[in-house]
């Protein structure tokens, strides 16, 4: 069996092993190698083929006796293959991956002014692909002539591409630029894939600008890497299949609805059925506050509780592959929407008001439920990706959610 893997200095969690397991039958490991140990690893390491990530995409080039034309032109290698004679051959699959992302997004870059945010390791490849597709590229960096202090020069940009790690997990909720500075912007791409929707993409969505994240690029470059590893041709349909599988695994299932509408019950059943962790924003608030929700209301009122709730959602919403039950009033703060939507599909559980319990729920106890529902229903609708009737059995509700996800 071939010995393949991902080479980098600090890898943390990687989706690459799961992607390559879908592509071919070879072992795929993670190789964290310190810079001082890189020469010995490349010359004597026990591997047949590798993907290469930061900070080694340029550092491996002197150890290659052969380079593909694209790797030579870009001066960047993210695929290494050990030949039969023991020498290393370098290639670049990132270019294929980014071009696939552009085409899949439907964003037309030909003849358009494209701003590339960042001049780090991925930027040169992205610039080359955009230029090849006919875009007029300007690079925005922290210290170059075109920088974040003079973005007003580029208000006519039509396409924005983020190549920086700004907004990447775990530091979500941040964006390198404010898209309102670019009134002619007609497309936004972000090569970050975790979270699925970065703050930049969320703003693009809110402004009605076509946009796409980096997961397509990640899967497409893995497919191209596998072709180089195994000297075979793989149908591009595999990219779509694996992308769909990953999205399903990474996406949170978020439940919203009135207090007592069954969110915690349904979350527990979904988590058991799908073998996912279950998260609860009310439980997170109680844990961090060190007191019950009624006590929080008694001590500081609803505003104090809502502030704690938003902090809890900021922490829980950036996780992935979980089932998240929220408090009934989380929709009262607009800033909670991106926290839930960045990695989640949001389901509004609807239940007849007569069936809703009030015990232990301060807002429900103080308010007329019909009036509370009338106030919140438009907010639930604004947050929700899907509406689920929860007047049947819990098992029936779970099945309805699974059908939507399928």
Where are these regions (language model features)?
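Phosphate/diphosphate ligand-binding glycine-rich loop within oxidoreductases
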Residues: 2-105, 195-197, 201, 207, ...
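Glycine-rich adenosine-cofactor-binding loop
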Residues: 8, 92-95, 102, 107, ...
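Rossmann-like adenosine-cofactor binding region
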Residues: 146-212, 330-336
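Adenosine-phosphate binding glycine-rich loop
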Residues: 192-251, 390
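NTP-dependent small-molecule kinase module
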Residues: 240-248, 253, 269, 273, ...
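Conserved lysine of the Walker
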Residues: 263
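A glycine- and Lys/Arg-enriched "phosphate-lid" helix/loop adjacent to the NTP-binding pocket
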Residues: 342-379, 386
